[in-house]
Amino acid sequence: MSQWYELQQLDSKFLEQVHQLYDDSFPMEIRQYLAQWLENQDWEHAANDVSFATIRFHDLLSQLDDQYSRFSLENNFLLQHNIRKSKRNLQDNFQEDPIQMSMIICNCLKEERKILENAQRFNQTQSGNIQSTVMLDKHKELDSKVRNVKDKVMCIEHEIKTLEDLQDEYDFKCKTLQNREHDTNGVAKNDQKQEQMLLQKMYLMLDNKRKEVVHKIIELLNVTELTQKALINDELVEWKRRQQSACIGGPPNACLDQLQNWFTIVAESLQQVRQQLKKLEELEQKYTYEHDPITKNKQALWDRTFSLFQQLIQSSFVVERQPCMPTHPQRPLVLKTGVQFTVKLRLLVKLQELNYNLKVKVLFDKDVSERNTVKGFRKFNILGTHTKVMNMEESTNGSLAAEFRHLQLKEQKNAGARTNEGPLIVTEELHSLSFETQLCQPGLVIDLETTSLPVVVISNVSQLPSGWASILWYNMLVAEPRNLSFFLNPPCARWSQLSEVLSWQFSSVTKRGLNVDQLNMLGEKLLGPTAGPDGLIPWTRFCKENINDKNFPFWLWIESILELIKKHLLSLWNDGCIVGFISKERERALLKDQQPGTFLLRFSESCREGAITFTWVERSQNGGEPYFHAVEPYTKKELSAVTFPDIIRNYKVMAAENIPENPLKYLYPNIDKDHAFGKYYSRPKEAPEPMELDGPKGTGYIKTELISVSEVHPSRLQTTDNLLPMSPEEFDEVSRMVGPVEFDMVSMTRGRS
């Protein structure tokens, strides 16, 4: 079963997340047509190899040609047109940059897998998840309140109809009596008195009905106000907070469809109340009297209805998808000058009459006081199409939305040399995107405005890790969208908050977050051995100060390890093969009672660019004290040449003139090395190219292989039973194999990292 087919079986709230992955740069229809083929390609490799990416780009175009031919046989003109258009767009966008296409496809497939996993976890825990049950009960209660508003409006509609009928009857009888009074024959006094008494009775009924209708409208507006407060102050605020968490790697935010449904029902109800008030005015114009309840209350009812509708419509204007560069989909809110970014707006009040009637304009740093109060605060211009009309056709789910896809930022250069004397560094300087539009209807003009979460603007991709750290810190600690002076005096974070966010950084790009032991080790690095959930970590400790005795800060170390995992260790991390973050004391405690040759994998604490090493345990020949050995850590340089599973498989220790042996036997706690890593070992390569095709023997190149060898003194090895002495000829052969060229890739043991 293809991944694409599984996705199509999910509930609508997960399908909406799938919809948000695809846009014009790589349309969903290509994903649909070439589902199986796309899933069978190694896009991660293509995203890091321009030659391979170019091949895959042309393969994709060929696949589209084949699909076009199939549609031709079926005489499907529309699909032929779509295929041809998609192919043309791909050529325009990626002909010169096929790696970009591979990155987009690779990311889409990864995000799809995360959505599937989240859906599976949701389905597994839904029945027993108390929090979900509480939220479900809360939503049921709110759903009931919204339905109650709608029902009351319908009830008032019926009451106004009854009032209109009563008033028509009263008016008819009044006119009839007047006509009879002017009749030459006249009417008997007794009959006239009876009819006047009847009219008086009808007048009282009419007055009571008007009072009743006005009272019910007041009651409706009271109920609507309470319901609206729950929507705006509770549900919408919670959604925005969940969006902040999702932006920094937290659980995917629940879709807006349910919220939109509630907002729309309340808005439709208020629009209907406006029509009902107009009807009451018409009835008042036909007939009024002293102390008429309509005359007395109509202005207050109009004002309150308008105020509620205005508040609802203004609150419904939200940023559905925060600003993000397509090149870095997992790092939203960090924007680089000169690089396009996207952002999506949505109106939660989905009224048909608003389709194509709201023109949205985007502005940068509108009304931002920091432009004038913070020294050195940079200023930017927005390039690209910065106006867009909201419509229901562009969104795959039919919501009223506007998506800006081709915006860029350009810094305003001031005359003279720029000074860096401001209190904020570039990656601590927060900016804001504002969006404004105006709703115009007969007798109704409402200005709408919303803002993005704060963004960090960088000019060099090397600033991305520090910029992302600022985004993490802000959205972890702050719920308000416009506190752009935050880093003038950033608050501390509790370890309970930061530990969760750190785990999200791993779970958002892999299948595995950080466990309790790993987090404990990181907590000790930041807070010392007394680390606890309420321990406070300053911003400078997290991101700016060198950690302990190292020459780099904590966050840059974590970021480098994340990059190492994504590019070289993803499968091993997902399978749980890597212990990763573990102190030396804890490492020895785990290994000391294990059988000789047991090893574990951990990240180096001393390497700025991110590195991984392995430590194994041995025992003296008499079975006494355990001894521990750790190899010099492997960085991306070594792992780019040889995969880590192959390094583990072929690793050798050579002492004096003994035959090299692999000391690694069991992955902690007791998993056979080949069982743990066998599926990741490189497969045999194709036959080597002959050196002389026309030679008498047709001999080819002798196959070579890069292996890691640690040359150590025999005294460092406690178990030498398996290290057999070599003959001079054997030693010469091994020395030739591990020559100067290969030793570029050889790790010489220099002690623990």
Swiss-Prot record:
GO terms for molecular function: DNA-binding transcription factor activity, RNA polymerase II-specific; protein homodimerization activity; RNA polymerase II cis-regulatory region sequence-specific DNA binding; RNA polymerase II core promoter sequence-specific DNA binding. InterPro entries: p53-like_TF_DNA-bd_sf (IPR008967), SH2 (IPR000980), SH2_dom_sf (IPR036860), STAT (IPR001217), STAT1_C_sf (IPR038295), STAT1_SH2 (IPR035859), STAT1_TAZ2-bd_C (IPR022752), STAT_linker (IPR048988). There is a cross-link at residue 703 (Glycyl lysine isopeptide (Lys-Gly) (interchain with G-Cter in SUMO1)). One of its GO terms (biological process) is negative regulation of endothelial cell proliferation. The modification N-acetylserine is found at residue 2. Keywords: Acetylation, Activator, ADP-ribosylation, Coiled coil, Cytoplasm, DNA-binding, Host-virus interaction, Isopeptide bond, Methylation, Nucleus, Phosphoprotein, SH2 domain, Transcription, Transcription regulation, Ubl conjugation. Residues 136-317 form a coiled coil. The modification Phosphotyrosine is found at residue 701. One of its GO terms (cellular component) is nucleolus. Phosphorylated on tyrosine and serine residues in response to a variety of cytokines/growth hormones including IFN-alpha, IFN-gamma, PDGF and EGF. Activated KIT promotes phosphorylation on tyrosine residues and subsequent translocation to the nucleus. Upon EGF stimulation, phosphorylation on Tyr-701 (lacking in beta form) by JAK1, JAK2 or TYK2 promotes dimerization and subsequent translocation to the nucleus. Growth hormone (GH) activates STAT1 signaling only via JAK2. Tyrosine phosphorylated in response to constitutively activated FGFR1, FGFR2, FGFR3 and FGFR4. Sumoylated with SUMO1, SUMO2 and SUMO3. Sumoylation is enhanced by IFN-gamma-induced phosphorylation on Ser-727, and by interaction with PIAS proteins. Enhances the transactivation activity. Belongs to the transcription factor STAT family. Homodimerizes upon IFN-gamma induced phosphorylation. Heterodimer with STAT2 upon IFN-alpha/beta induced phosphorylation. The heterodimer STAT1:STAT2 forms the interferon-stimulated gene factor 3 complex (ISGF3) with IRF9. Interacts (phosphorylated at Ser-727) with PIAS1; the interaction results in release of STAT1 from its target gene. Interacts with IFNAR1. Interacts with IFNAR2. Found in a complex with NMI and CREBBP/CBP. Interacts with NMI which is required for CREBBP/CBP recruitment to the complex. Interacts with PTK2/FAK1. Interacts with SRC. Interacts with ERBB4 (phosphorylated). This is Signal transducer and activator of transcription 1. It comes from Sus scrofa.
